[in-house]
UniProtKB/Swiss-Prot annotation:
It comes from Bacillus subtilis (strain 168). Disulfide bonds join 351-368. This is Rhamnulokinase. The gene is rhaB. Pathway: Carbohydrate degradation; L-rhamnose degradation; glycerone phosphate from L-rhamnose: step 2/3. One of its GO terms (cellular component) is cytosol. Gene3D superfamilies: 3.30.420.40. The active site is at 234 (proton acceptor). The keyword Disulfide bond applies.
């Protein structure tokens, strides 16, 4: 059986095929394409038609390789959505979570419901771009015309099959799902002026969505596909592919964002979890991904784009190695870095405000970013141990960031934990494995992780002896200084 993963991230997408051979997963990249938002009509908008076109081109390539039949699963980033009318047509283009319309919405909604009340209901961390805040800022007249609100991966599946669902791992990120009941919360829906029936029925990963409607796409020669729901939130798919064993391990799903957390059976909605802004997102097989959403490779992606010389990410890491780490302390989670006009100038301005050495060269900028990511990761690991009351012995970095040896070593040094890097294509791998579990070719997630360990090289980074406590203290003092400006 051939399985196809459609994995669309915030900056790029890829289509991978995979099959299981003697307990090992063989995967092949078939198609890769760019993704990103553009500034149009006063908003940051996604080009959904571009994504659909690329998906169809990729599926056509699958057939060109001789695969007449396959199953398909789709995952994407979280929180963003489309609004559809009764005919199933989009009422407008999908707005990106990086749009500035929700900059102050957390405070606005707090006039209706307190943070504590929302957290007890949802267990979801407070991010200005969460779906609940996007819907709060929606045009009320547009919402009245809306028949269905669909998360991006659900909408892409709908475009291929005509079947509308709301997959649970992605909708859990909206801050509208009640963590206790597993249903959309009526009070939260009312607070943002939407109705429960505007969402399609909730569904779990591993369900058959429907057959690809080839007749809708006469310009493409497509295989006969059965489309499955997978863990449609890309992080939920990636965590399936985290090669952890038993307990005592944490993960960073490292891409445009860094999601750092542990896998639990039950949510943690304590005051300490709220205070530290941790989230309880749904995972596959009724698990809870207790994690923190941290700014990730977005910052270096923006810097790379703005540098005058054409550096690869590997070259930037090599340049960073030539620079002494921990020369600047920057809170990259500050909302000023979410979508600034110029990331390089924003970093330099932060350093100027806090009277630190200003990074100017490509190597200095890269080293500054990677050093501070490592510090932020280390702080989050310590928080996880405190909140969960469990020690973390192993730390798995999965996703694109796993190939960054420089950052991986800094993370090991700052956390004092052994870092295990890989697999790199964790999200697509988890997508494929979820399809295999649904097809009963793989028994469960435990067996899926054994398949990962059998199939992919895992690189180990051991921590060096550094004065990590002093570095973290300096970071925290500088961050407090910046907040007082």
């Amino acid at each position: 059986m051939i399985y196809t993963a459609i994995d669309v991230g915030a900056s790029s997408g890829r289509i991978m095929v995979g099959e299981l051979n003697e307990g090992k997963l063989d995967i092949q990249e078939i198609h890769r394409f760019a993704n990103g938002f553009s500034q149009r009509d006063g908003h940051c908008l996604w080009d959904i038609d571009h994504l659909l076109k690329q998906i169809l081109q990729g599926l056509q390539k699958v057939k060109t390789l001789g695969y007449e039949h396959c199953t398909v699963g789709i995952d994407t980033w979280a929180v963003d959505y489309v609004l559809l009318d009764e005919k199933g047509d989009r009422l407008r283009e999908a707005i990106s979570y990086r749009d500035r319309r929700t900059d102050h919405t957390i405070d606005k909604l707090e006039h209706t419901l307190s943070k504590a009340a929302i957290y007890q209901k949802t267990g979801i961390q407070f991010q200005p771009f969460n779906t609940i805040y996007q819907l709060f800022e929606e045009d009320r007249e547009l919402l009245k015309k809306t028949d269905k609100i669909m998360m991006i991966p659900d909408y892409l599946g709908y475009c291929l099959t005509g079947k509308a669902v709301t997959e649970i791992t992605n909708v859990s990120t909206t801050q509208l799902l009640n963590v206790s009941t597993g249903n959309l919360d009526p009070e939260l829906l009312e607070a943002v002026s939407v109705l429960e029936q505007q969402f399609a029925p909730l569904t779990e990963p591993g369900c058959e969505l429907g057959k690809l409607r080839n007749e809708w796409f006469p310009d493409y020669d497509l295989p006969a596909c059965k489309v499955m729901t997978v863990a449609t939130h890309d992080t939920a798919s990636a965590v399936i592919a985290a090669p952890g064993v038993n307990d005592g391990w944490a993960y960073i799903s490292s891409g445009t964002w860094s999601l750092i957390g542990v896998e639990n059976k039950t949510p943690i909605i304590t005051d300490l979890a709220l205070e530290n802004n941790y989230t309880n997102e749904r995972g596959a097989n009724n698990t809870i991904r207790f994690l923190k959403n941290i700014i990730g490779m977005w910052v270096i992606q923006e810097v790379k784009q703005q540098l005058q010389a054409d550096y690869s990410f590997q070259q930037l890491a090599e340049e960073a190695k030539k620079t002494e780490p921990f020369q600047q302390f920057i809170n990259l989670n500050d909302k000023r870095f979410l979508n600034p006009e110029n990331m390089i100038k924003e970093i330099q301005h932060y350093c100027r405000q806090t009277r630190q050495k200003i990074p100017r060269t490509a190597g200095e900028l890269a080293c500054c970013i990677y050093s501070n990511l490592a510090i932020i990761y280390a702080i989050a690991i310590k928080e996880l141990e405190t909140i969960t009351e469990k020690p973390i012995e192993q730390f798995h970095i999965i996703g694109g960031g796993a190939r960054n040896d420089f950052l991986n070593q800094l993370t090991a040094d700052m956390s004092g934990k052994a870092v295990y890097a890989g697999p790199i294509e964790a999200t697509a791998t988890g997508n494929l494995l979820m399809q295999m579990i649904a097809a009963k070719e793989v028994k469960d997630i435990k067996e899926a992780r054994q398949v990962v360990r059998n199939s992919f090289p895992i690189k180990v980074f051991t921590p060096k002896d550094i004065d990590r406590s002093t570095i973290i203290q300096s970071f925290q003092q500088t961050v407090l200084k910046a907040l007082s400006k």
